[in-house]
């Protein structure tokens, strides 16, 4: 019944249309104005305005990141700690981290002075050195090592990873190189380099970087394989776009979030490696203040209740920097994901 009514209505409309066409333009003029078609107006300015998108990748990334209040607070605190660590020697009234302070009246060293007494903000160690100055100097040393290691690993790892994943002819070579390097524990290599070479900041940076890039390269390679043969990359190759331009314009922007996350995780990992290698006595010499040396010194007196501050303060700095970099890296990685820009 319903289909029959629709057919009758359709036939009626067709009949009216045929009649109007037969009568000519005069019949159209008799129709009410609201039944006539009204042509849409065209404005070139409005067309341009509606076709333009004001989307900005980095703008959307930072907007998404700043919505995470915990990450923002951690970022502000981390910037303050890192900035103070490097600016602390320039401030007035700061002690030499390697100076063994003595009592001018007796000539005896200020040994194991409690925090807040006799001008020692965080106390002194067993030979009268100011822990406030030594902890910030140790933070500078550890952060410097971590930043350089992260930078070297990023540059080498990204370069090798892109070549490994995009250039098919190099896949076999880099795969075998990865298998060789990955089968040797990085801790063993770090210990051997620290044992053979003289202990220094440069030695630790070299030892951590010589194998650290492997994980970054493999990670980038796997990501490149996912997007290498997508339509826009195949089209770019077909029209003769240089490989370097495809990598810079098509591949690397897609990997910004994961690269930032890997770099953010490399920094606390490098600090942890420095602490470990120094803790076992193969890292920096005891004259060089570092978080590893300070924690090792604090470990020796941790069983004495009145001296546990020597382990507590460097451990707090180490824990905060490590956790902050990890959480901020994860938050920025989530914010850099374009899927989160639509929320």
Positions of predicted regions on the chain:
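Gly/Trp-centered helix-boundary motif
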Residues: 1-158, 162, 169, 183, ...
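Hydrophobic core positions of alpha-helical segments in small-molecule transporters
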Residues: 75-77, 145-149, 177, 190, ...
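Generic hydrophobic transmembrane alpha-helix motif, especially the helices
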Residues: 121, 152-157, 162-227, 260
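Amphipathic cytosolic juxtamembrane alpha-helices at the membrane-cytosol interface
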Residues: 129-144, 148, 169-171, 175, ...
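Transmembrane alpha-helical interface segments in multi-pass membrane proteins
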Residues: 151-160, 182, 247-248, 252-260, ...
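Hydrophobic alpha-helical interface/terminus motif in multipass membrane transporters
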Residues: 160-164, 193, 220, 233, ...
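Non-cytoplasmic
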Residues: 191-192, 196, 200-205, 209-212, ...
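Alpha-helical transmembrane segments
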Residues: 213, 217, 270, 321-325
């Amino acid at each position: 019944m319903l289909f029959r009514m629709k057919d009758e209505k359709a036939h009626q409309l067709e009949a009216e249309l045929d009649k109007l066409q037969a009568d000519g333009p005069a019949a159209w003029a008799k129709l009410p104005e609201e039944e006539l078609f009204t042509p849409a107006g065209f404005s070139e300015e409005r067309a341009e305005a509606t076709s333009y998108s004001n989307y900005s990748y980095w703008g959307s990334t930072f907007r998404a990141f700043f919505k995470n209040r915990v990450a923002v607070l951690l970022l502000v605190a981390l910037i303050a700690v890192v900035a103070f660590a490097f600016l602390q020697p320039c401030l007035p009234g700061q002690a030499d981290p390697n100076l063994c302070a003595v009592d001018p009246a007796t000539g005896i060293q200020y040994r194991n002075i409690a925090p807040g007494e006799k001008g020692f903000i965080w106390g002194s160690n067993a030979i009268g050195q100011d822990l406030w100055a030594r902890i910030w100097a140790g933070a500078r040393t550890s952060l410097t090592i971590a930043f350089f290691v992260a930078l070297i690993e990023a540059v080498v790892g990204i370069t090798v990873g892109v070549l490994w994943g995009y250039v098919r002819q190099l896949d076999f070579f880099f795969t075998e190189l990865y298998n060789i390097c990955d089968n040797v524990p990085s801790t063993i290599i770090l210990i051997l380099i620290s044992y053979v070479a003289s202990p220094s900041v440069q030695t630790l940076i070299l030892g951590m970087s010589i194998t650290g890039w492997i994980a970054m390269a493999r990670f980038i390679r796997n990501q490149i394989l996912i997007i290498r043969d997508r339509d826009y990359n195949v089209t770019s190759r077909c029209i003769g776009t240089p490989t370097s331009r495809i990598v810079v314009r098509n591949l690397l922007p897609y990997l910004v979030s994961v690269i930032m996350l890997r770099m953010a995780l490399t920094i606390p990992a490098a600090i942890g490696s420095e602490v470990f290698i120094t803790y076992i006595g193969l890292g920096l010499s005891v004259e060089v203040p570092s978080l590893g040396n300070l924690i090792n010194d604090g470990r020796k007196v941790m069983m004495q209740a009145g001296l546990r501050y020597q382990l507590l303060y460097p451990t707090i700095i180490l824990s905060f920097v490590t956790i902050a970099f990890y959480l901020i890296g994860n938050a920025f990685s989530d914010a850099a994901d374009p899927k989160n820009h639509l929320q």
